[in-house]
């Protein structure tokens, strides 16, 4: 396994891209080579914040210059740019959702496979210390209750709340249950945008596990909580605090308490370190393209159910 520093670049220098640039710049295993954005001023500003980093406006110029790259562009560009980088022999960490359509996601997965490249997808909550502690405790998941509420942010108007927020929780539930749902029920409302801003979903899995999920980007407070019920145990995780608590009924019928997520690390940094480790070892990443495609597929099923039942559009005051 080579110990040389990996040459790295970030494609897309918006808010997410800027955070990735920071994480890479902090890594002792990488050399930040380039910041790429179609907006030359944005690329220049991003590169200027990191000495030795070159500003580029065309991602194609990365061929031969870097070993790894982050794709943090709008979702509609993920497939084109991701596949192009993979074909150029570059390992890729691509932001979620993996692509705009399932077909595009499958193309990314196949391209990575055909060219022997690592493809990891940025489902950041998988690197939340509370979630990682939860994973180690799951036995037979029976019921999930998950809430993810945010204040409105104009940056995400190109996607609905299901693909913007709920997909994190869909990915986690699929990873913990290990199966696809056999039934999907969903309702959604458009409040402040032309996309669904609030969604409520019920997933039923083979074996009887149920997951109730609510996501909203029209809230006065930020809420990120997961509750899992399984035989003799209730586990609560606070994504924001990266911690939680497990309540377990013992043989003596007494309830024991166990705190979770004590070894905290910034998820973005943990994600990058994990990606670098996969690249060096040529091993499967923690969040594979295949897993991200399944999460996207379920999200598309949810959106189809919402449209099937007619997404409610909030009335303006003069219509009431």
What are the language-model segments listed below?
Residues 94, 119-121, 237:
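Hydrophobic residues in well-ordered beta-strands that form the structural core
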Residues 1-50, 173:
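N-terminal Rossmann-like dinucleotide-binding module
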């Amino acid at each position: 396994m080579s110990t040389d520093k990996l040459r790295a670049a970030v494609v897309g220098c918006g808010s997410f891209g800027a955070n990735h640039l920071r994480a890479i710049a902090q890594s002792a295993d990488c050399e930040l080579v380039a910041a790429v954005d179609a907006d030359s001023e944005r690329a220049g500003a991003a590169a200027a914040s990191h000495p030795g980093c070159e500003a580029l406006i065309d991602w194609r110029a990365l061929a031969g210059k870097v070993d790894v790259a982050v794709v943090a562009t709008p979702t509609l560009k993920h497939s084109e740019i991701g596949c192009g980088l993979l074909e150029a022999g570059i390992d890729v960490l691509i932001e979620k959702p993996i692509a705009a359509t399932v077909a595009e996601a499958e193309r990314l997965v196949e391209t990575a496979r055909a060219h022997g490249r690592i493809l990891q997808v940025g489902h950041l909550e998988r690197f939340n210390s509370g979630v990682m502690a939860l994973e180690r405790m799951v036995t037979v998941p029976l019921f999930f209750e998950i809430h993810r509420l945010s204040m409105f942010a104009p940056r995400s108007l190109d996607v609905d709340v299901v693909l913007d927020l709920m997909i994190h929780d869909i990915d986690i539930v699929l990873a913990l249950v290990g199966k696809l749902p056999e039934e999907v029920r969903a309702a959604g409302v458009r409040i402040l945008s032309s996309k669904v801003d609030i969604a409520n979903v019920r997933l039923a899995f083979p074996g009887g596990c149920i997951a109730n999920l609510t996501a909203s980007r029209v809230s006065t407070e930020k809420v990120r909580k997961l509750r899992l019920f399984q035989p003799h145990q209730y586990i609560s995780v606070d994504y924001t605090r990266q911690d939680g608590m497990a309540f377990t009924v013992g043989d003596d019928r007494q309830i024991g308490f166990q705190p979770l997520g004590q070894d905290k690390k910034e998820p973005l940094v943990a994600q990058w370190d994990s990606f670098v480790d996969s690249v060096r070892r040529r091993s499967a990443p923690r969040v594979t393209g295949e897993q991200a495609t399944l999460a996207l597929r379920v999200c598309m099923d949810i959106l189809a159910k919402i449209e099937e039942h007619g997404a409610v559009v909030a009335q303006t005051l003069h219509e009431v």
